[in-house]
C-alpha cells in the first residue's frame, strides 16, 4: 500500500525509482479509507537523506500512511535549505492539537552534550509528553531513543571511550514479543554513536523490556508498556552507504576514526559495504506499524 507525501518532495523521485508505492494527497483523498497518520520528527542535519531512509522502510508495508514531517522550531537548521523546511515540514506548534497513529523520533548528532544542553531540549520534552496521550505508538531511534529513555524513565546515557561504529550481531532476548515477529535469533544492525545506555539500567526499570542486545554494541531494542514506546539504539534504517559516508566525512575532517566494524568486505574501506541488516530493518518497521500502530489505533483518533 502507498504512503501519502507531497508531490514535490525530493524523496518522492528516489522512492519511485525503487518501486516504493507513493501517492499524492489529491489521489488519496478520493479513496474511501483512512490512512494512518504518521509524524516523523526529523532531528538529523541530513534531512533529505533521513527522509528517504525512513520513507523507504515505512512505505514497504501493505498500509496506507499519511506522513507529516516535523522539525524543531527552537533550532536553526544550517544543513538544509529553509525553502525545504518551509515547503515540506511543520513544527510542533502546527500539530499539537492533532492526534497521530504513530510518531518516529530520529537520532541527532548531539549525544556528547547532556540532554539539558541541547538547544531544543525543552521543545522535545513537550513533544515527548504530548506523545503519551496523543500518539498510539512512538518509535525512538538512536539519540532519540536515549532521549526518550531518559525523559520517560530516567535512564542515563554514558560516554564511550571509542565510537561504537559498524554493523554488529544482536541476539533476540524475548522470543514472543510482536515487535520481533519473524526475527532470526541472531540478526545484524548498524550502530554509530559516542554514548550508550546500559543493560543494568534498562532491567532496573520494571516498565521496560529488553528485546535485543549485542555483546559488543550493547542495548539495541527496548519496549515500554503495551508498545506505546519503542526504542531502537541502532540504525536499522541506514542505507547501504551511510556508514561509508560518515567514515569518509570524519576522515576529511582529520578525525581519528576507525574503519566501521563488520561493514566493508574484508574490513577494507576500498571494497564495497556488505549489507546484512536490510531484511531485519524492514521487518522491524513493518512489525511496529502493523502490531503497535495499525492494530492498536482507533478508527477515530
From Swiss-Prot:
Give the positions the UniProt entry annotates as the active site.
142, 235, 237
Enzyme class comes to transferase
Q: Which GO terms describe its biological process?
A: L-methionine biosynthetic process from homoserine via O-succinyl-L-homoserine and cystathionine
Question: Which GO MF terms are attached to this record?
Answer: homoserine O-acetyltransferase activity; homoserine O-succinyltransferase activity
Chief place where the protein resides: cytoplasm
Keywords for this protein: Acyltransferase, Amino-acid biosynthesis, Cytoplasm, Methionine biosynthesis, Transferase
EC number in record? 2.3.1.31
Quote the Pfam families the UniProt record gives: HTS
The site annotation (Important for substrate specificity) covers 192
Gene3D superfamilies, A to Z:
3.40.50.880
Would I find Ligase among this entry's keywords? no
- According to its UniProt record, where is this protein located? Cytoplasm
Where are the residues marked Important for acyl-CoA specificity as a site? 111
Report the InterPro entries cross-referenced here.
Class_I_gatase-like (IPR029062), HST_MetA (IPR005697), MetA_family (IPR033752)
> Which cellular component terms (GO) are annotated to the entry?
cytoplasm
**Pathway per the UniProt entry:** Amino-acid biosynthesis; L-methionine biosynthesis via de novo pathway; O-acetyl-L-homoserine from L-homoserine: step 1/1
Q: Record-annotated residues binding substrate?
A: 163, 192, 249
Q: Which reaction does it catalyse?
A: L-homoserine + acetyl-CoA = O-acetyl-L-homoserine + CoA
Protein family according to the UniProt entry: Belongs to the MetA family.
Protein purpose: Transfers an acetyl group from acetyl-CoA to L-homoserine, forming acetyl-L-homoserine.
What is this protein's name?
Homoserine O-acetyltransferase
**Which organism is the protein's source?**
Bacillus cereus (strain AH820)
The top of its lineage is: Bacteria, Bacillati, Bacillota, Bacilli, Bacillales
**Gene symbol?**
metAA
